[in-house]
Every structure is written in structure tokens, then in C-alpha cells.
Amino acid sequence: MDKSLLPNIYEFISHTYPFSQLNDLEKDATATKIQITYHTLGEELNNETLAGIGLFMIRTGVVEERNKSDGSLRAKFSAGDTFGFTQIDKEGDSDYKVVFLENTLLYVLPKNVLHFLIEKNKEVGDYFNAKEWIRLSSSHNYADEVTADEKGT
């Protein structure tokens, strides 16, 4: 990766919860591991291009998750959102496909790096925890952070 892109990646993860909770050293290390991909309108991710890859963070653009069976909408994401966590430990076929609704720049955090952060950082671990009550608590912490940022504290 071009080292001149690192400040942009660092800035992005510094404003993307839960990665905003990492210390400076963790953010530096994480930024160096992120892969950058670009996708055009109408492109799709599915199966081996989605399952088992990592966490996809949308830098710019809009995507939809669509059920493979009937094409129905599962979710819609835009800049600052993440997707792919439910597919991170899968191999082969994915549960859904991702369709790009416009040209999109993705930051991809490899699954081994995300697993390391989940294990080593409480905020990241809580955010991606399988237990609903822990995830909800993490979301509450995120809401508090956003409110504090809006107030300028």
C-alpha cells in the first residue's frame, strides 16, 4: 500500500466506532493492515469475495445486502458503515450478496486483524460480541460518544 494513504485511513478509523476507541499505537498498527478496494456501480461481492475475507468499511459509496434466494433487501449501508462481520468466519458460499449502488471505496480489515483486536481491546470485543446484551451496552457507549462529540466535549 502507498504509505501516503495511511493518514487518511488513520483519520477514518479514528472516527469509526469502535475503532475510535483504540489507542494511537493500535490505530497506527490497524491502519497499516487495511486493504483498499474500489468497486463500480452494479458490481457484486458474494461467496469467496465476501465470505471469510474480513470487515468491510465503507469510505465512500453506497451498498445493499441482498438475500441470494429471492433478492430481497437485507440492509443498506453508506459511508462510515461496516458490513461483512457475519460472514467473517465462513468459507465458500456467503449467506447473502452485496451490490454496489454507486462507485464505492472500501477499507477492508482482514479477519485475522479484526480477531486480534476483538481479543485485545474491550470496546472492539464488546461491539462485535455474540451476546446481544453486551452489543447493546456497546451501542449505548457509542451513543454517549456521539452526543459528547456534538456538544464539543
Which residues fall in each region the model found?
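A short hydrophobic beta-strand segment most commonly corresponding to one strand
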Residues: 103-114
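Hydrophobic residues at beta-strand termini and immediately following loops
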Residues: 37-39, 77, 109
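Short leucine-rich amphipathic alpha-helices used at interfaces
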Residues: 4-5, 10, 85, 91-92, ...
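A short, N-terminal "cap"/entry segment at the start of jelly-roll beta-barrel domains
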Residues: 1-7, 11, 17-25
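Short proline/glycine- and basic residue-enriched helix-capping loop/turn segments at helix->loop/beta transitions
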Residues: 20-41
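A small-molecule sensor/coupling module
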Residues: 26, 93-96, 112-152
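Cyclic nucleotide-binding regulatory domains
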Residues: 18, 43-103, 129, 133-135
